[in-house]
Amino acid sequence: MEELGRNVDVSIFRILRFMNLRKYIGIDNEMLMYYFGKELSKNLNFKNFKELSNFYKEYKLGRIEMVSENPIKIRIYDCISCSGLPDVGKPLCHFEAGFLAGYIENVFNKKCYIIETHCWGLGNKFCQFEVRLVDNKKSENCFASSGDCNGYFGKNRTKKL
């Protein structure tokens, strides 16, 4: 590992990230990336936002900040998945959504719904996620770009600033 280094070029990460997995294994990469991120975050078992923020910084995933705690809004600058990409009319950060959902669910011991409201893919210069805690632990997970979370966030929540 010392000879190879710890860093992977962002273009290699994005090639893997945006591959058409449905063509090869019959699964949408959006949901797969969401669950990869969620599982990774749950296994890392961050105890607080500082640990999460330090991990993002150390592994060069982006710069993360808590915008508000009620409702929970988390912003990522220099996001590894989308920073610098053109406006494609949709959010792109499924891995990050899952990663944040795993963190939130560990800390609060509740399921959550998460929506990416800002993204380079939507024409913004940062990513922002809004989280809603769900009291019922048996409720379905939901990342709003893959469904409407039963209307939990209302309509047209993705926007440009």
From Swiss-Prot:
InterPro entries: DUF2507, NO_sig/Golgi_transp_ligand-bd, V4R. It comes from the Archaea. PANTHER family: ARSR FAMILY TRANSCRIPTIONAL REGULATOR (PTHR35090:SF2), DNA-DIRECTED RNA POLYMERASE SUBUNIT I (PTHR35090). Belongs to the M.jannaschii MJ0150/MJ0739/MJ0745/MJ1460/MJ1642 family. This is Uncharacterized protein MJ1642. It comes from Methanocaldococcus jannaschii (strain ATCC 43067 / DSM 2661 / JAL-1 / JCM 10045 / NBRC 100440) (Methanococcus jannaschii).
